[in-house]
Structure formats: structure tokens, C-alpha cells
């Protein structure tokens, strides 16, 4: 009986081994890239494949935006099929750290905190920090962070905008962080807050949709938000220690210029869905 049980277990292990090998070989031809699919102009969800959108794994929807453009370039250079995985913001780093996905391309700042658990590529976009308010707001003519004093404000959860920038506003009434960038913009549009802090691409996308929003950019002045270079450099996160994949991504980025990044972002903003 014991020999039969051992033989059965060995057979099961061999069977599982062959199955795993087959799955591994199949997965080698697929590049799994995670993003929110709700963060225009970086990434968003749409119902068709227009403009080159890519199917979102496990759904009938498609993803597009700057991050998808970049993911397509990387997958093509590696000769792999691109698979987009839709995750909420807080699940992105754990997913790539555990190896559930190959990389995250989602407008992530290259922060020291994130670098403790994942590796980052060279920057794939440089995103300055700006403020959005309404045209009829008391803050519409602000020329410095100090001019935003006393404002009721919010931003997106888990971002440097909320964690680092909002506390720099004197006597700010900081409300609960919003789960997504669209929710942050709705808070401003509805009048729930006086202003939100975000990055330039998100703000440009917002003003293209909401005609009553005003973009305030204090960058390069004495009254700008105090942030480090790492906090405004956006990178592609990869599982720690995967040097081969990191090198492959950086090789693609090395072929692109800042002007290329800006042109791609402009294209993304031009075709973003109004709902985003």
C-alpha cells in the first residue's frame, strides 16, 4: 500500500511538473503589465480597440493611454504578446513585488519607499507638480503655494500629491484622499473642495474635459511645491532582482527622448475619453 501511495504521489508530481512547464513556456511569450486603467491620460478603460487599445485581461474592455503606448513599445521590442492587467492603485506594487505581473506602468513616482520592495527603470516621464482649481475660485490667481492658504483640498490616495504636497499649503483643510484620479477631479468639479494637487499630464487632461478648471503651475519659482527629483520622475516598476527585464526596459527607454515622451503624452491627451 505504501509503495502504491508513493507511486501515485510521484505520478501526480510529474504531471503537475509537466503542466507547470507548459504554462511557464506559454507565459514566457506574454508580458503582463499592470495599471489602474482609470488614470487618464496615463491609462484608461474603453469599450473598443480604437486608437490601438489593448484588451484588459479577464474583461470585455480595452485599455489605452500613455502607459499602454509605452507597454506596447516594450512588448514589441521583446517579441512578446502584451497582456494588460487592471488593478487598483494599492495593489500595483504588491502584484509586481510578488511576481504576479511582470511590471507596472502606471504613472508611479520613483520613491525611496517603493524602491525598498521593487526595482525601477529609468524615468519614462518627468511630471511636474501643479494645482487645479475652478475659474471662479478665490484661488484662481494664486502665484505660489502660500497663496493657497486655508484652502479645502484633496488629491489621490497613495500619491506624493496627497502625502507630501498638500501638507505644504498653510492652514489647509485636507479632506480624505480620493481612490482614483477621476474621483479627485469630480471632488473639485462638484465644489466639494477648492483645489486639488496633481501632476501636469493629469491637469492638462482635466482642463481638456472641464472647461471651468484652471491650472496653476508654480514650478521654477520661489513659491513652488518642494519635492525631490525622485518624486517627479516616473518609472516602470519591476520585481526586485530581475536585472534582465530591467535592462530590456531601459534599452527601450534609451531610444526615446524627452520630446518623444511629450509627443506621446500629447497624443494620449488628444484621444482620452471624456468620461475619464
Question: Which residue stretches match the model-derived regions?
Answer:
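Short, low-complexity disordered leader/linker segments with a strong preference
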Residues: 1-30, 276
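Periplasmic-binding protein-like
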Residues: 38, 126-133, 209-253, 271-276
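A ligand-binding cleft/hinge motif common to bilobed small-molecule-binding domains
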Residues: 91, 97, 107-117, 163-167, ...
Amino acid at each position: 500500500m505504501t509503495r502504491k501511495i508513493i507511486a501515485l504521489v510521484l505520478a501526480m508530481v510529474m504531471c503537475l511538473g509537466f503542466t507547470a512547464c507548459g504554462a511557464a513556456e506559454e507565459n514566457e511569450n506574454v508580458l503582463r503589465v499592470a495599471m489602474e486603467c482609470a488614470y487618464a491620460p496615463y491609462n484608461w478603460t474603453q469599450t473598443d480597440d480604437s486608437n490601438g487599445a489593448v484588451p484588459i485581461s479577464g474583461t470585455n474592455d480595452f485599455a489605452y493611454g500613455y502607459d499602454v503606448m509605452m507597454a506596447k513599445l516594450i512588448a514589441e521590442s521583446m517579441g512578446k504578446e502584451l497582456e494588460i492587467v487592471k488593478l487598483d492603485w494599492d495593489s500595483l506594487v504588491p502584484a509586481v513585488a510578488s511576481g504576479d505581473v511582470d511590471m507596472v506602468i502606471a504613472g508611479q513616482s520613483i520613491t525611496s519607499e517603493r524602491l525598498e520592495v521593487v526595482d525601477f527603470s529609468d524615468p519614462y516621464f518627468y511630471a511636474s507638480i501643479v494645482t487645479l482649481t475652478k475659474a471662479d475660485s478665490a484661488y484662481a490667481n494664486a502665484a505660489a503655494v502660500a497663496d493657497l492658504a486655508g484652502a479645502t483640498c484633496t488629491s489621490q490616495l497613495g500619491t506624493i500629491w496627497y502625502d507630501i504636497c498638500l501638507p505644504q499649503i498653510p492652514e489647509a483643510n485636507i479632506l480624505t484622499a480620493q481612490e482614483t484620479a477621476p474621483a479627485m477631479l469630480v471632488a473639485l468639479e462638484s465644489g466639494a473642495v477648492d483645489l486639488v494637487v496633481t501632476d501636469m499630464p493629469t491637469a492638462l487632461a482635466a482642463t481638456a474635459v472641464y472647461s471651468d478648471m484652471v491650472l496653476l503651475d508654480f514650478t521654477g519659482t520661489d513659491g513652488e511645491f518642494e519635492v525631490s527629483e525622485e518624486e517627479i520622475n516616473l518609472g516602470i516598476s519591476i520585481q526586485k532582482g530581475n536585472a534582465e527585464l530591467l535592462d530590456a526596459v531601459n534599452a527601450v527607454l534609451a531610444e526615446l527622448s524627452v520630446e518623444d515622451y511629450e509627443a506621446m503624452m500629447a497624443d494620449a491627451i488628444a484621444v482620452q475619453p471624456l468620461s475619464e
